[in-house]
Amino acid sequence: MIKRITSFGAILGMFLLSYSVQAEQTIAGGMDVSEGDPKAGKAKSELCHGCHGVDGMSIDPTTFPNLAGQYAGYIFKQVQDFQLGNRQDDTMSAMAGMVTSREDLRDIAVYFQSQKKMKGKPTDSALAKQGAKIFKDGVPKAGVYGCINCHGKNGKGKGPNNSLFPVIGGQTKAYLVKQLNDLKSGKRKNDPAGMMAAIAKKLSDKEIQAVAEYLAGQ
């Protein structure tokens, strides 16, 4: 059963990863996000540093996510979604509105992607071990395949740039829990094809805590 679900997840992951290359061009209006200028992006992202840190590591892990090493395409898409109202957050919706050009957003996104990839502090807790199993094997009885299929080994991502499946290994636990709960409740609706919402709805509160605990330590 685990093998069947994992194989299905791998096939779906490859399909959506291929789709993401085309989607990135559409999201950016035909512009190649990866060609942004990280040096210019550092200056343009000054306001971002107050929450996400100069190095892309959150100044308050209970509130703000890490951006260090995150895919530029994913950052670009999320900021656009905040601008368009497809994703809601009081702070980010306001901040996103201050980025007035796609070129500036591209430079900012590439700046954060250029940083050393986010890294957490490993924990040997029973909860983290449960989360590791969910991440790798999924929850077969609930029809949930392993997160590794789309998010890569240890949650560090798959592909050179990916606008759909973010780096989540080393992300803050509070942010991961909130996003999974928001997807589960329907508060967040900008995931591709509703895929993550469907998964989150099948996870128990404890399973959400477990997978977030594991990923926060990667």
Question: Which stretches of residues belong to each language-model region?
Answer:
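Electrostatic cytochrome c docking/interface patches
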Residues: E24-S45, S58-P61, S114-K141
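Bacterial N-terminal signal peptides that target proteins for export
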Residues: M1-G9
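Sec/Tat signal peptide C-region and signal peptidase I cleavage site
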Residues: Y19-A23
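Axial heme c-ligation environment in periplasmic c-type cytochrome domains
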Residues: I59-N66, D81-T123, P160-V167, K184-Q218
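Detector for the c-type heme attachment site
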Residues: G50-M57, Q113-S114, C150-K156, A216-G217
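The feature marks the first
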Residues: A28-L84
